Regions:
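Signal for well-folded cores of large energy- and translation-related assemblies
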Residues: 79, 140, 174, 194, ...
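Non-catalytic surface loops within mature trypsin-like serine protease
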Residues: 28, 121, 231-233, 262, ...
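ABC transporter nucleotide-binding domains
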Residues: 2-6, 11-185, 190-204, 210
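C-terminal coupling/interaction segments
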Residues: 261-315
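Short, surface-exposed acidic/glycine-rich loop or hinge patches that mediate macromolecular interfaces
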Residues: 65-68, 208, 232-234, 261-264, ...
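Non-catalytic alpha-helical coupling and interface elements of nucleotide-dependent molecular machines
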Residues: 102-106, 198, 222, 278, ...
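ABC transporter nucleotide-binding domain
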Residues: 171-260
Length: 315
């Protein structure tokens, strides 16, 4: 059973089509990144999944239930971290969690939830009016985890967190997915989406323009991977473009930059270069999710690269 499934999901506001014919599937235990520029239709789609808004056409199913016809069957099985939320300044974090546990009629320990999101027990007994943005974000996430939901819907979960907190958030999300929870989240920090997600969907102008793994998006856009080989001497007689799967070669000082339409040819290129000159360093690069996002939302071909771990060369 899919955690989320939409068919021809459409929402109109008068003459404006905010979401058009969206067909989306998120599987159980999957971490799915939901991306798009402002005004692309992400929030409207999420609101229809949560039955905060009714579709003009099409259907949305959440955990096997129709989101509009069976919302009560869904509510206690999902956890939500909304983009905008209000906390009660005069209540402590522990009191917030006790309220959330009662509201869901769940069997949960506030102290365990507090530990799970990286808050201290001392902080849990402070009034949240003095909390930082990052601490408030952790508290709302802890509330979302009440009852061990089958689906987490997270809007900008890393907002307000420092790098350490972002890493902890990523580990927490992965841990929930390992337990079988589906995680559906939107974020503007594309590097975090790339690091955490199994698949991504990209919305643009109300349409779902892409739904794939990050590597699958690279293949579909034709975003070539590259090797940068630093050499002791650039051999003028070396011909790498004759290798099928090599799409281009350029020279930058003492480095060869080789682009590939078929990344499987990298080893063959390294072997040929190594036979002609001394290789001092190798880096492998590929288009980042940010560049792929630009390619789908602006119609630009991804050109920049994001380093992978260095390759190893044997003489």
């Amino acid at each position: 059973m899919a955690a989320i499934r939409t068919q021809s999901l459409t929402k109109r506001f008068g003459d404006v089509v905010a979401v058009r014919d969206v067909n989306l599937t998120v599987e159980e235990g999957e971490i799915f990144g939901f991306l798009g520029p402002n005004g692309a239709g992400k929030s409207t789609t999420i609101n229809m999944l949560l039955d905060f808004m009714r579709p003009s056409e099409g259907t949305a199913e959440v955990l096997g239930h129709d989101a509009q016809k069976e919302p009560r069957a869904i509510r206690n099985r999902i956890g939500i971290l909304p983009g905008g939320y209000d906390l009660y300044d005069r209540l402590t974090a522990r009191e917030h969690l006790e309220f959330a546990i009662d509201a869901k009629n769940a069997d949960a320990d506030p102290s365990e939830l507090i530990d799970r999101v990286g808050l201290s027990q001392e902080d849990a007994d402070r009034k949240v009016g003095g909390y930082s943005k990052g601490m408030a974000q952790r508290l709302v996430l802890a509330s979302a985890l009440v009852g061990d939901p089958d689906l987490l819907i997270l809007d900008e979960p890393s907002s307000g967190l420092d790098p350490h907190g972002i890493r902890e958030m990523r580990e927490l999300i992965r841990g929930e997915a390992d337990r079988g929870t589906a995680v559906f989240f939107s974020s503007h920090i594309l590097s975090e989406v790339e690091a955490a997600c199994d698949r991504v969907g990209i919305m643009n102008n109300g349409r779902l323009v892409a739904e794939n793994t990050v590597e699958g998006l690279r293949e579909l856009t034709g975003a070539s991977s590259q090797l940068i080989l630093k050499v002791g001497r650039v051999p003028t007689e070396l011909d790498l473009t004759s290798i099928e799967g090599v799409s281009g070669v350029s020279v930058d000082d003492s480095a060869l930059r080789v682009s590939f339409s078929d990344p499987g040819k990298k080893a063959q290129v390294v072997k040929r270069v190594d036979a002609a000159t001394r290789i001092t360093d190798i880096k492998s690069e590929q288009a980042s999710l940010e560049e792929l996002f630009d390619s789908y939302t602006r119609g630009e071909e991804p050109t920049g690269r994001k380093p992978e771990s260095p390759a190893e060369v044997s003489a």
